Amino acid sequence: LISIGGSPGYRGMQYPDALFPSGLRVLLPEDSPRVASEDEFRFGYLIRISEDAVMEGHKDGRYKATHLRYPMIYGPRQPIPCEWWVVKRILDKRSSIVLPDSGLTIITRGYAENMAEAVLLTVDQGERASGKIYNCGDDHQLTMAQWVQVIARAMNSTMEIISIPVEYATPSRDMMIGRKHSNHLHYDTYAMRSELGYKDKIPVLEAFNRTVEWYMSNPPSLNKATESNLAQHYNDEDKLIKINVEIIQKYEKLSLANAVFKHAYAHPKKPGDTKDHLGR
């Protein structure tokens, strides 16, 4: 039996302050703390007890089970079209995009064909994988800002990234699966790579190119769960960008000391010198 789930069962995935220090561990191993109760995060708790039920059946000898924790999947035919919101902005001639906290967040992603490879490796090595839980994801992970850059390059375009504090970067929520924080969700996939020999079948940059090509030929058919009010998002983005410009102008008027970093290691000029010109 191969079961497939995801990240919501990890404590802190939705509510970073459930952990100390706040936010998930980077990298995030399979044995990290999980949601403990419905009160903490009901959806995550249901994921957690579902995993437990699968593995209990394995322990009881009813079947041999392996559980795969999938990342955010991208590529053709995905029900959650996160990349589409970047593609659509470029098609709509938007020159900039609001991202939370400079778009530095890493949310583990996996190209559909690569994640299918993870399943096949599990099938082929059933005995070795039996009773195990594996995080899955592309070997090469990108920040949000990087995947915006990659998508824009694939469309022969560019897109300026406007950094807005995560609390106010609401137009980007569709791309973050509704997350209201910018903490990383960066899986540790060492077990899958070292035990089952996983490596990306399709390199990530090529995978994004294929994804863009798919969306250009097959715009997603959206439903009430996946549609987005882009007109409202664009209006909100324009307001946020205007405020951002005003703030930067205020920063530029400040007289700030430009501290020059000096490392602590001495640079003696000749043999026998005990200190250099900086007294190190």
Predicted features and spans:
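Hydrophobic/aromatic beta-strand patches that form the interior of the parallel beta-sheet core
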Residues: 2, 66-68, 134
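Active-site beta-alpha turn of Rossmann-fold NAD(P)-dependent dehydrogenases/reductases
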Residues: 5, 58, 69-71, 137
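Active-site Tyr-X1-5-Lys
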Residues: 27-67, 82
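Residue-level signal for the nucleotide or nucleotide-sugar donor/cofactor binding architecture
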Residues: 45, 110, 139-142, 187, ...
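Alpha-helical substrate-binding/gating segment
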Residues: 87-97, 105-142, 149, 153
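Mid/C-terminal beta-alpha module of Rossmann-like enzyme folds, strongest
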Residues: 124-189, 195, 209-210, 222-225, ...
